[in-house]
């Protein structure tokens, strides 16, 4: 997380790591957190040889063009987990001194979860073009 501290984070000039509110604008536009996850995930499954997600990859259409891929995460140590199952993205907003807000896409559902995790974890980030 320290690599993305602040809205500029690791993004190139003219871009920034989205805030929690900016992610909410996207999820609201796509129909709300309870149903927009499938619109943000790539389609296909590992088992069928057509994608990167494990079965069932519920509701995945990627109609938004977000192209969420299930990179999983790294824990506070050196363990990588949830690859093929989750796409986890940090926002630039802190929950507390040791925690940060993020968004999560899940292979078995169509929701987008608004969660907070230990800043020592390794989640993916997205860069959003400045207005």
Model-derived regions, located:
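Conserved positions within compact, well-structured domain cores
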Residues: 1-131
């Amino acid at each position: 997380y320290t690599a993305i501290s602040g809205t500029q984070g690791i993004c190139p000039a003219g871009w920034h790591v989205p805030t929690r509110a900016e992610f909410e604008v996207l999820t609201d536009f796509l129909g709300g957190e309870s149903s927009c996850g499938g619109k943000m995930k790539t389609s296909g499954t590992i088992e069928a040889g057509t994608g990167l997600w494990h079965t069932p990859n519920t509701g995945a259409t990627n109609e938004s063009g977000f192209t969420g891929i299930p990179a999983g995460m790294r824990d506070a140590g050196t363990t990588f987990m949830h690859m093929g199952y989750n796409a986890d993205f940090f926002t630039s907003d802190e929950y507390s001194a040791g925690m940060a807000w993020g968004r999560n896409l899940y292979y078995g559902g169509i929701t987008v979860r608004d969660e907070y995790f230990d800043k020592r974890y390794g989640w993916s980030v997205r860069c959003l073009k400045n207005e």
